[in-house]
Amino acid sequence: MAKSSFKLEHPLERRQAEAARIREKYPDRIPVIVEKAERSDIPDIDKKKYLVPADLTVGQFVYVVRKRIKLSAEKAIFIFVKNILPPTAAMMSAIYEEHKDEDGFLYMTYSGENTFGSF
């Protein structure tokens, strides 16, 4: 998978400092970066950075993403963390602890197709 454009735009030290500051200021929130998968025909999201409540489920967060990209109900959306489709009932806090990046952010990619084929 291509390197996140957020990672390309911001050096590691700056991302680490920002994530640490966010976690300190908002201990019950998770810093998440959401980006569209390459070659996906789904709309672009208007903002990449989210402060997500730790007790939100993946399914609830998918709903937030759907709203942000104004995706119609009949269109599918898949959210991946490190090319894996996380369970919709999983807590964002658990996904964060398991998959957070070295910079302290959780990176999620969304697509209109199940591009990676792993459940």
Swiss-Prot record:
GO biological process entries: autophagosome assembly; autophagosome maturation; cellular response to nitrogen starvation; defense response to fungus; mitophagy
Quick one: a GO cellular component term?
Answer: cytoplasmic vesicle
Instruction: Reply yes or no: does the keyword Nucleotide-binding apply.
Output: no
Record PTM: The C-terminal 2 residues are removed by ATG4 to expose Gly-117 at the C-terminus. The C-terminal Gly is then amidated with phosphatidylethanolamine by an activating system similar to that for ubiquitin. The phosphatidylethanolamine amidated glycine is required for autophagosome formation.
Question: In this chain's numbering, which residues are marked as the site (Cleavage)?
Answer: G117, S118
The answer, when asked if Membrane is one of the entry's keywords, is yes
Provide the protein's localization. Cytoplasmic vesicle, Autophagosome membrane; Vacuole membrane; Cytoplasm, Cytoskeleton
Q: Which residues are the propeptide, according to the record?
A: 118-119
Q: Which GO terms describe its molecular function?
A: phosphatidylethanolamine binding
Q: How does the entry describe its membrane topology?
A: Lipid-anchor
Family as reported in the entry's similarity comment: Belongs to the ATG8 family.
Q: What does this protein do?
A: Ubiquitin-like modifier involved in autophagosomes formation. May mediate the delivery of the autophagosomes to the vacuole via the microtubule cytoskeleton. ATG8CL-mediated selective autophagy contributes to defense against the fungal pathogen Phytophtora infestans.
Quaternary form?
Answer: Interacts with ATG4. Interacts with the Phytophtora infestans effector PexRD54. Interacts with JOKA2.
Entry protein name: Autophagy-related protein 8C-like
Q: Which organism is it from?
A: Solanum tuberosum
